[in-house]
């Protein structure tokens, strides 16, 4: 088998009927005047920002933020200049208590995590403006489940952070004998107090990586 890259996986999937159908639906919606997030050039940013062999940590989100210009292809992240969404505020709150010296940044762009080896994957990669989960059933999860399966099969000793019920449904794809899985509630204001705040997933991730003789993640942004 040739060296596995995201380009190879995408080139295989893009020719399959389900994948073509996703973009047929997106193009139809755009023609009808609907606004789709993220911008088309940003949909696959998670694959551009973190090479397959560089991944150490996988954080699984649900679908992109559906507000104006919030989504840019990385789960939980927003571009510079966009106000922090509530879930991201809670992520920073947990980091402040979990990681000594962490200073809450004034922006919500998590791209530097991507460069550290943190794969910020939404299971649904697009959304209609103002309509959460509007693209939940157009086929994206067939693709992102394949991505998770590929990581599970061809990598080992990854840390999977599964926050909330939706992410936790992906645990059946992940072999917990090969990988380290950490589970807690979603960081949204509705559920953060039921486990996320105080979970210490960031320090636990680094402890695991250090025990595997891997470089730890610099969570400071």
Swiss-Prot record:
Pfam families the UniProt entry points to: UDG
GO biological process: base-excision repair, AP site formation via deaminated base removal
InterPro entries, A to Z: UDG_fam1, Ura-DNA_Glyclase_AS, Uracil-DNA_glycosylase-like, Uracil-DNA_glycosylase-like_sf
One GO molecular-function entry: uracil DNA N-glycosylase activity
Key words, A-Z: Cytoplasm, DNA damage, DNA repair, Hydrolase
Active site per UniProt: 63 (proton acceptor)
Chain ranges passing through the membrane: none
Record bears the keyword DNA damage: yes
Family membership: Belongs to the uracil-DNA glycosylase (UDG) superfamily. UNG family.
Function per UniProt: Excises uracil residues from the DNA which can arise as a result of misincorporation of dUMP residues by DNA polymerase or due to deamination of cytosine.
Alphabetical list of PANTHER family matching this protein: URACIL-DNA GLYCOSYLASE
This protein's name: Uracil-DNA glycosylase
UniProt source species: Blochmanniella floridana
